[in-house]
Amino acid sequence: MGFLSKLIAKLKPKKSVAKQLKEEVEKQSLFQTNNKTYYQGLKKSATTFAKTINELSKRYVNVDEQFKENLFEGLVLLDVGYHAANKICDAIIEQIKLNRITDFQLIKELIIDQIIVYYIQDKLFDTDLIVKPNFTNVYLFVGVNGVGKTTTLAKIADFFIKQNKRVLLVAGDTFRAGAIEQLNQWAKLLNCDIVLPNPKEQTPAVIFRGVKKGIDDKYDFVLCDTSGRLQNKLNLMNELQKIYQIIQKVSGSEPSETLLVLDGTVGQTGLSQAKVFNEFSKLTGIVLTKMDGSAKGGIILAIKDMFNLPVKLIGFGEKTSDLAIFDLEKYVLGLLNNLNLDNKEN
């Protein structure tokens, strides 16, 4: 599978500050994953896709409309999205015909190749978290209820605290008392400071106080939790827009990161969430959680296709160490792990 590494290496961006920081603490467990983690976390998705492709290999005679239809079906079942699935299928068939490929093992490798090429296209996203040096970096976490915003925020806080960075948590989920208590418990566990809402205080006011304190007291990071909100509730989306504008006004710049946390099991529903949240707050990236319970691993390609947004973090479970910076090569290898690429028999 060396061709994957070579293909990705050609398009890798220069090291960001976050990349350099990450390398300084490479002995820390958070955000470090090996191939096995991806294989286990994407097991359901890999099984779904492999079933289609391996069945296709048994019936394979030549490249025709039936072949394309079955390949398309396999990609759609992963929630790659219709547009992306069509483009990938067309590219695969074009390469098969151009190079007169008949060995299905080579076709399997070509499928992987074209998925990588499609995701990268003109460039490979830098999936590291944005970190501005000598600056109070404000991270805003948004999403619907129950996707894991608060837990994700705490895991990222843990990551930076282990680098001896000063981190301030802001409990902006004023709709749910449990969320405030949850984040407060995380603050105690991580031994970091937190801004809690006053009685009846609304989210925008809490965010204002938190960001101002973070800047005035020269914290390295201010991590802002927000209430879960459905994308079809206009009043709540308008409040999110107000929160975003408050951060801009207080800090003098946009948040370093505005991360939409998506439940990886919801598939195409996540795309409609991303569309609306991106309209009301300028998203910088996606965090996909609960991928260990999802058979829809192709959603990452659909997000890239529709919004040109990077998936920055991917979660495979509830433990602190189960959140990883998204690694394209490990992701693709995990997604296609059951394709039996080392087996020379169809």
UniProtKB/Swiss-Prot annotation:
Cross-referenced InterPro entries: AAA+_ATPase, P-loop_NTPase, Signal_recog_particl_SRP54_hlx, SR_rcpt_FtsY, SRP/SRP_N, SRP54_GTPase_dom, SRP54_N_sf
Q: Do you know which HAMAP family this protein is assigned to?
A: FtsY
**Species of origin:** Mycoplasma genitalium (strain ATCC 33530 / DSM 19775 / NCTC 10195 / G37)
Q: Which SUPFAM superfamilies match?
A: Domain of the SRP/SRP receptor G-proteins, P-loop containing nucleoside triphosphate hydrolases
In the record, what terms sit under GO molecular function? ATP hydrolysis activity; GTP binding; GTPase activity; signal recognition particle binding
Name of this protein: Signal recognition particle receptor FtsY
**Topology term for the membrane:** Peripheral membrane protein
Q: Which residues bind GTP?
A: 143-150, 225-229, 289-292
The listed locations are:
Cell membrane; Cytoplasm
Write out the catalysed reaction.
Answer: GTP + H2O = GDP + phosphate + H(+)
Relate the protein's function as given in its record.
Involved in targeting and insertion of nascent membrane proteins into the cytoplasmic membrane. Acts as a receptor for the complex formed by the signal recognition particle (SRP) and the ribosome-nascent chain (RNC).
SMART domains, sorted: AAA, SRP54, SRP54_N
The gene it comes from is ftsY
| Family under the similarity heading | Belongs to the GTP-binding SRP family. FtsY subfamily.
